[in-house]
Structures are given as structure tokens and as C-alpha cells.
């Protein structure tokens, strides 16, 4: 038998007819049409409740107290420890390089190098502050600090 376009049909079970609900007791989905009896889910538009609505109980966002705020006086300077700096490649280090290396959080506007650990590479700091101890360690390793 040859295959013809007019003989093509989908495989068995590939296309099922949409179940029509509320069309008589014999269908198995008559009367309440699978919605049960009464309640919000039985009504049209039922089940659509606001996010955070807890059925009339005081919702979580109103039960818990308000906490904290973002202070305008907050420190916007990130501390970078000298041993973290040593993980970078030797050379020029500026604020953008520190941010690219994920040593400075995105909220910080400035950075300051703090001495902790040893420095083995030569760094030239540009536009980054350093403590007196960190400055001495950088210069001892052959680097410099330009503010």
C-alpha cells in the first residue's frame, strides 16, 4: 500500500478532545462541573486571591514589625585586605580593577587597602586609599600609592 497525503492521520492518543464540563450527569462532570460545592473556588473568578492574603487573618507583612533602613550616613568605603590584593596580577590597581575582581561590593563608592598578611607582588595603587601599614607594605614590595 502506498502512502498518500489523504491517508495521513495523527497517531492514536496524540489528539484528545477537550472535556466539556457541566453537560449532564452521564458525563461524570455534570452539575458542579468538577468545582465542588460552594466556596470561592466554585464561583466564577474564584481562586484569584491577592498575594499575601491569608483568608482574613492578619497577613505576615502586617504582623511583623518594620525593621531597619538605609542610612544616608552609612560607610560607602569598602575594605580590601592586602592578602586579597595579592591574588590580583601585579601592576596598576584602581577601583574598577578591584570591582572587576569582586573584591568590592557593588554598593561601595570607594575602597581602602588594609594591611593583613603578606604582599609578594608589585602594585601601583591609583585612586584607592591605603592605611599607613598597607602603604608601607606596598612600597616595601616595590610598588607605590598614588592618591
Swiss-Prot record:
The UniProt record lists the keyword Ribosomal protein: yes
A GO molecular-function descriptor: rRNA binding
Biased composition (Basic and acidic residues): 1-20
PROSITE patterns (alphabetical): RIBOSOMAL_L15
Function: Binds to the 23S rRNA.
Quaternary state and interactors: Part of the 50S ribosomal subunit.
Keyword entries, A-Z: Ribonucleoprotein, Ribosomal protein, RNA-binding, rRNA-binding
Xref: InterPro entries: Ribosomal_uL15, Ribosomal_uL15/eL18, Ribosomal_uL15/eL18_sf, Ribosomal_uL15_bac-type, Ribosomal_uL15_CS
Record's compositionally biased regions (Gly residues): 23-33
Record-stated family: Belongs to the universal ribosomal protein uL15 family.
Domain of life the protein comes from: Bacteria
Protein name: Large ribosomal subunit protein uL15
GO BP, sorted A to Z: translation
Pfam family, one: Ribosomal_L27A
Stretches for region Disordered: 1-61
HAMAP family recorded: Ribosomal_uL15 (MF_01341)
Segments of skewed composition (Basic residues): 34-47
Gene Ontology annotations for the cellular component aspect, listed alphabetically: cytosolic large ribosomal subunit
Record has RNA-binding as a keyword: yes
Origin organism lineage: Bacteria, Pseudomonadati, Pseudomonadota, Gammaproteobacteria, Lysobacterales
